[in-house]
Amino acid sequence: LCDRRQRQTCIRDSRMAYTENFIIFWEKGFGNDLSNPPQLEGHSMKVNLPNLKEKLESFYTYFYHTLQFAKQGSKCDKYRMMVMINYSLEGTAYGGDYDGQIGALWITPNRVQDEKLNCIAHELGHSFQSQITCDGQGEAWGGCGFFEMTSQWMLWQVNPDWMTDEKYHWDAFKTLTHKAYLHLDNIYHSPYVLEYWGIRHGLPFIAELYRQGKRGEDPVITYKRLNSLGQKEFCNEMFDACRHFVNWDFKRVWKETRPYANQYTCKMNPSKEGWYQVAPENCPENYGFNAVPLSVPQPGSAVEVEFLGEAGREGYNSVHPEKAGWRYGFVAV
C-alpha cells in the first residue's frame, strides 16, 4: 500500500504513475510508455494515461465528497487507491479492494478507450462500495446484485448521458419493467429506483444504505427499516417512483432523457366483455410495473378505468397469491 504521508517508502519503477488519490501500475508487456506500447496479437494496447488520471480524480471527488461513500477518517485519507492495468485482450474490468484495506481497480486497455471512461466510473463505484467495508463501517448485506445497480447509478451521476451512451441497457429495461425489483435480469439496466431514492432522501442516503445493510436483509428491507416504512407505505413509494419513470420526471436529467420519455409498450390480450388482460410474459412481479399507452381523449373528456387484480390465475406465475396487491393510476404527459 502507498501511504501518502511516506511516499518515499512506495514501490518506484518506470511502470508506475500516481495522482493525489491513485497509484497506477501497468504490466511489463506495455513497456515504459502507455501511449506507445507493443501491439498484442495485432491489437493496439495504448492507454491515454492523462485522461485516465483526470477522470479517476474527478470520479473520486464526486464519490467521496458528494455521494459520501467514504467519510473523514477513511483509509482513503491515508492510502491511495490502486489501479492495475493488465497487458491482456480480455474485456474484464473489476472494481473492489486490495487486501481489505483500500479500494482498487483491475482493468485492460480495451475497457478504457472511450473518452468519458464509463467503465471506470462503474468499476470505481465498486471500489467505493468496498471501501465502506474496508473502513469497518458496515457489511453491505455481504454482497448482492444491488452492487451492480448502484455502480450504474454512480456512473449516471457523473455522466448524465449514460442512457444514450449505453442505450442497450435502456432497450433491455423497457421490455423488462415487469420484472421484480432487484431481479438479476435488470441489475445492470435499472438504476432508476436509486435515482428516486437519492432525490427523496439526499444523494448520501445510498451510501448509508450500504453502511446499514445487514446480512440476512436485502436493500428493500434495509430501506424500509431506515425509513420506518410498513409494506403499504413502501408500495406507495414504489408506485410513485414508477410513475416518474414514464416521462422521466427527474430534473437532473430532464434534457438527456427526452428521447426515452413515454416509450413503453405492454402486451395486452383481449378478453370477454371488452376487458384487456396483461399477457403472462409481461405480468408484473414484485414491485414491477406495466405502462399501458392510451389514446389521448378530446379536451374536457372524462377518463375512467375499471381495474381488476386477479391473483393465482391459471397460466400465470403465482407465488403467495394471498399477499398480492396492486397500485394503478394515470400518468399525464
Predicted feature residues:
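Solvent-exposed loop and beta-edge segments used for protein-protein assembly and interaction
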Residues: 18, 186-188, 297-299
